[in-house]
Amino acid sequence: MDIKTALSRIVGHLDLSTEEMRSVMREIMTGQCTDAQIGAFMMAMRMKSESIDEIVGAVSAMRELADRVELKTLDGVVDVVGTGGDGANIFNVSTASSFVVAAAGCTVAKHGNRAVSGKSGSADLLEAAGIYLNLTPVQVARCIDNVGIGFMFAQSHHGAMKYAAGPRRDLGLRTLFNMLGPLTNPAGVKHQVVGVFTQALCRPLAEVLQRLGSKHVLVVHSQDGLDEFSLAAPTYVAELKNDQITEYWVQPEDLGMKSQSLFGLVVESPAASLELIRDALGRRKTEHGQKAAEMIVLNAGAALYAADHASSLKEGVALAHDALHTGLAREKLEELGAFTAVFKQENEG
């Protein structure tokens, strides 16, 4: 199906099949559509509302065209990722959590990009930390094998997305493409914590990942609007495990933590986010650093559970707490920087 036919269908509020959507996305991502067609398609899809079949088709096309990272095994390899767009501007919780997960002995294949709407995306933060981002897929795999964590910069692995970049920027609205990043990890991980910008997406994205073969995934949105677990409010979870989806609310107290406000966790830049994270992963000299550490532990615990490294969310949080207090997470951050510096020299001379 071509994009013109698809548009006439969508404008009539008719859904596309998975295969039809895959075909249209291939057209878009191989440069066969005009900016006007892509913009109209994104807007029409948003107004109609995307079906599960359509999201599965879009994700399938994007995965096919990605520069994949081949790992020795995907057993227990996890990604902690969010759609962004929650407007909260708090520090990079999922990225910081990833280093605690690695410190706990669990392998992390982190996928991320620059900020969507916030002040600091995962790529912005890691760049500020001196981590080289423009790695080849083989180099990312070597990071994961040697350090226990590697970062896949979305722009490097999803080059075909460049064709939609202009229309996305010009529209300035959330579209289907905002959902695709967390669902298109180039290593093909089967274990994830996926934060989303609205609770309404939790169940649908869990169903999409179920259709695409994921093993254990938590799709989450907190009552106070975050695309991650919150210390300040209950968090809604759609959990895919054993090919079944269950939905529930989680309070910090359920996991052995204390509810508290997010005051002091908002950042204005990647450098400010990095400073807070280094304090949280280090000696926690400030009150805000201590609070950030607890937010990190909460989300790292969820990732350890999703990776089947822990048998429950509560056990995952306890393991994450222990891992953070060893100081090893801070060491992992520095180690990844040193490891990627070698690749920078190889790639840039």
From Swiss-Prot:
Pathway: Amino-acid biosynthesis; L-tryptophan biosynthesis; L-tryptophan from chorismate: step 2/5. InterPro entries: Anthranilate_Pribosyl_Tfrase (IPR005940), Glycosyl_Trfase_fam3 (IPR000312), Glycosyl_Trfase_fam3_N_dom (IPR017459), Glycosyl_Trfase_fam3_N_dom_sf (IPR036320), Nuc_phospho_transferase (IPR035902). SUPFAM superfamilies: Nucleoside phosphorylase/phosphoribosyltransferase catalytic domain, Nucleoside phosphorylase/phosphoribosyltransferase N-terminal domain. Anthranilate 1 binds at G82, N113. It catalyses: N-(5-phospho-beta-D-ribosyl)anthranilate + diphosphate = 5-phospho-alpha-D-ribose 1-diphosphate + anthranilate. Its EC number is 2.4.2.18. One of its GO terms (cellular component) is cytosol. Anthranilate 2 binds at R168. It is an enzyme of class 2 (transferase). GO terms for molecular function: anthranilate phosphoribosyltransferase activity; magnesium ion binding. GO terms for biological process: L-tryptophan biosynthetic process. The keyword Transferase applies. Binds 2 magnesium ions per monomer. Its cofactor is Mg(2+). 5-phospho-alpha-D-ribose 1-diphosphate binds at residues 82, 85-86, 92-95, 110-118, 122. Mg(2+) 2 binds at D227, E228. Belongs to the anthranilate phosphoribosyltransferase family. Homodimer. This is Anthranilate phosphoribosyltransferase. The lineage of its organism: Bacteria, Pseudomonadati, Pseudomonadota, Gammaproteobacteria, Pseudomonadales. The gene is trpD.
